[in-house]
Amino acid sequence: MSVVLPALDEEATVGGVVAAVRPLLGTLVDEIVVVDSGSTDATAARAREAGARVVRRDAVLPDVPVRPGKGEVLWRSLAATSGDLVVFLDSDLVDLGPDFVVNLLGPLLTVDGVALVKGFYHRPLRLPSSGMADTDAALTGGGRVTELTARPALAALRPELAGVVQPLGGEYAATRELLESLPFAAGYGVEIGLLLDTHTTRGLDAIAQVDLGVRKHRHRSLRALGATAAEVLDAVLRRCVPGHPGADPLTQFVPVDGDWLPDEQAVATADRPPLATQRATGS
């Protein structure tokens, strides 16, 4: 069984995540792999010190040109690992224990037909400007992109998945057989893309959820979340609306000297093919 942590400039937290999982090495877990997507800080060193194997994103499938985004890192991680089961954990988690991994694996090991297990949790997000909790996240169970983009999109276009508490959560487990059979959406659309594609190809009974208790993580700016929401929405539309052409760059506006100036951000939209297809065709 493989535990995968995608990481980009997470030197403050990645070592703690690896250390939390390390007690399971040699028993339930065969390998802990941190896939570094170009960190400029000490992420790789901290991960190695904590006991993980670190691979660079561009060192995996080196003949395939690298694209930006989280989905790219997770897709390449399949080629860098070997476990029949794969657990994905975000690298910015704080105060987690090995029970995260144990609980995510439970349904895969005990329930016939389950191929994807999504974690859900309470999110006591601290707002850095005030030190106060994000009460919206506490009351709804999801973050801002989940509540304002993902959940309404699923309700409108795939209501069978409306019961998924954390459709965008970065803590989940799946069989390698499933993961290598599915395309990986680019960027932050990867989690909802895998959820939708699992439902399409395997049905609702292939998806399980587990309560992981509390998830503490870093805060991201509203502007950054706008680009995340665009990638999530594009992944949904590509899978639920035939003929959807893909997203254009996202135009946001920033205040400069009393004026509002447009600022375009690229939206990662191109799916990677199933890894099984990539291996078979080499393209």
State each model region's role.
Residues 1-2, 31, 193, 198:
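Cell-envelope/extracellular polymer assembly enzymes that use nucleotide-activated donors
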Residues 19-29:
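Short, acidic, metal-binding catalytic loop of nucleotide-sugar glycosyltransferases
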Residues 1-20:
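N-proximal low-complexity "stem/linker" segments adjacent to membrane-targeting elements
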Residues 62-70, 96-176:
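Acceptor/aglycone-binding surface of glycosyltransferases and processive sugar-polymer synthases
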Residues 136-235:
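Conserved catalytic loops of nucleotide-sugar-dependent glycosyltransferases that act on lipid-linked
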Residues 36-45:
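A conserved acidic beta->alpha catalytic loop
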